[in-house]
Amino acid sequence: MNQATEIAKLLLNIKAVTLNLHEPYRYTSGILSPIYCDNRLIISYPEKRKMIIEAFLQLIEKNHLSFDIVAGTATAGIPHAAWIADRLDLPMIYVRAKAKTHGKQNQIEGRIRKGQRALIVEDLISTGKSALAAGLALREKGVTVTDCIAIFSYQLPQAQQNFSDANINCHALSHFDTLIEMAVDEGYIDEIEKQKALAWNKDPEHWQP
């Protein structure tokens, strides 16, 4: 079993990812979806989160990612960014979706300087907007951002386009297609439901259960 498959199985086992083809979930965007991902659950499982961090470190090494500061997206990316930074003995920051309206009105928490190279850490990639917003905020402060890592990606066409437009590489530990295959193998869904899920993945805006 390869790493992407192991991560997919982990997410299904702890119910971080749930599938419901008959009563789909509605996202805040209004889109209906047969899949819902809540990777925040991982932090409650010490052994599972260790697996995730080890997988992240292997991904970083395999892809020769170069950076000197780890940037978590608020809030779900923060714990994973902290654990990665701790293992690599690197500075860590986190980036809000927008600046606070009180105090120092910071969007970026932690110390940064121009010329640094930041790695964005996200828990989930749907359209990629939160990760890319973090990358843009850092670039505006003179920080170089070329890569983002995430636990899971829905592999939506919009996300692929958004990352390409921003000239940021997105690396995920596991992906939608791998998870759907694992869901069939483990008996979470059948072949008919698998085809419906794949149809959603290709065109989520027009998908119907």
Swiss-Prot record:
PROSITE patterns: PUR_PYR_PR_TRANSFER
Binding residues annotated for 5-phospho-alpha-D-ribose 1-diphosphate, in chain numbering: R96, K100, H102, E122, D123, L124, I125, S126, T127, G128, K129, S130
Keyword field contains Glycosyltransferase: yes
Record bears the keyword Cell wall biogenesis/degradation: no
Binding site for orotate: S126
A single GO BP: 'de novo' UMP biosynthetic process
Catalysed reactions, as listed in the record: orotidine 5'-phosphate + diphosphate = orotate + 5-phospho-alpha-D-ribose 1-diphosphate
Cofactor annotation: Mg(2+)
Keywords: Glycosyltransferase, Magnesium, Pyrimidine biosynthesis, Transferase
EC number(s) reported in the record: 2.4.2.10
Extent of the signal sequence: none
GO molecular function: magnesium ion binding; orotate phosphoribosyltransferase activity
Metabolic or biological pathway: Pyrimidine metabolism; UMP biosynthesis via de novo pathway; UMP from orotate: step 1/2
CDD domains: PRTases_typeI
Functional description taken from the UniProt entry: Catalyzes the transfer of a ribosyl phosphate group from 5-phosphoribose 1-diphosphate to orotate, leading to the formation of orotidine monophosphate (OMP).
Family: Belongs to the purine/pyrimidine phosphoribosyltransferase family. PyrE subfamily.
Assembly behavior: Homodimer.
Protein name: Orotate phosphoribosyltransferase
Source species of the chain: Coxiella burnetii (strain RSA 493 / Nine Mile phase I)
Gene: pyrE
